[in-house]
């Protein structure tokens, strides 16, 4: 179902199945396929040779580059053709050869992606992942199933993330990181094997986090990684330190929710 304005923006070689819903000013490039159950919001541009399968909803002003695969079946041997979905927000950039898969019934049956994210070429988002806003996944970075990637996190090129792992807000993973346990908010990791390497103070400063909050986060990092405290004791001390700091409180709440342990 398309508006008349949309029809002029669909290349004649593109295939749009009948139940797909395209808002105004959506552009579909040559040889792309838009399947049944796909909804695309206003101003979104889909390049050539893109495949989008439903149920998938895509918000406004996204840019999807050539040869990307959006809303494909999950790569899970337990998947048995159940109806599951992919939800993508607004203003995301999805570069060439990226793949974003639908969810599975073993979780919430949906993969969720927020707003203003950048997925560079050859990135992969597996089934049931939940991604926040303003995330960057550099070329070749891949998320296994059920990963949570919180807002403003950055994954360097070819970073691999184990299933069910949580990566906190404003965290940073260097190129080629192998992440097998949770990464607390604001923490930088890298190396072989991948280990913590301080806090992402530059990213915090760029996003307007105050010098006082950065000082508190740096002190919390030392409690977790430098003072030989049990994690539970470090969390208790961080909670006492947090006061009115939303950032440090977010770090405490994240650590209390950890189930796989944190990368050390």
Stretches found by the model and what they are:
Residues 1-13, 18, 24-25, 61, ...:
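Terminal amphipathic alpha-helical/low-complexity segments used for targeting or macromolecular assembly
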Residues 4, 9-190, 194-195:
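Structural signal for interior beta-strand "rungs" in well-ordered beta-sheet cores
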């Amino acid at each position: 179902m398309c508006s008349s304005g949309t029809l002029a923006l669909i290349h004649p070689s593109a295939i749009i199945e009948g139940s797909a819903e395209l808002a105004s000013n959506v552009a579909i490039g040559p040889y792309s396929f838009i399947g049944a159950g796909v909804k695309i919001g206003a101003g979104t541009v889909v390049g050539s040779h893109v495949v989008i399968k439903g149920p998938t909803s895509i918000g406004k002003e996204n840019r999807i580059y050539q040869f990307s695969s959006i809303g494909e079946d999950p790569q899970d041997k337990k998947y048995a053709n159940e109806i599951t979905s992919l939800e993508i927000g607004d203003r995301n950039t999805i570069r060439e050869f990226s793949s974003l898969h639908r969810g599975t019934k073993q979780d919430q049956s949906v993969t969720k992606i927020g707003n203003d994210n950048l997925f560079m070429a050859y990135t992969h988002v597996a089934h049931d992942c939940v991604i926040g806003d303003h995330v960057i996944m550099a070329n070749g970075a891949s998320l296994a199933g059920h990963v949570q990637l919180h807002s403003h996190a950055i994954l360097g090129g070819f970073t691999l993330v184990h299933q069910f792992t949580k990566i906190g807000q404003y965290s940073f993973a260097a190129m080629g990181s192998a992440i097998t346990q949770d990464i607390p908010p604001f923490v930088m990791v890298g190396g072989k094997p991948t280990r913590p390497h301080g806090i992402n103070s530059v990213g915090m400063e760029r996003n307007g986090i105050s010098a006082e909050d950065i000082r508190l986060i740096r002190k919390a990092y030392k409690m977790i990684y430098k003072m030989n405290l049990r994690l539970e004791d470090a969390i208790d001390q961080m909670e006492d330190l947090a006061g009115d700091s939303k950032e440090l409180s977010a770090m405490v709440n994240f650590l209390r929710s950890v189930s796989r342990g944190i990368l050390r």
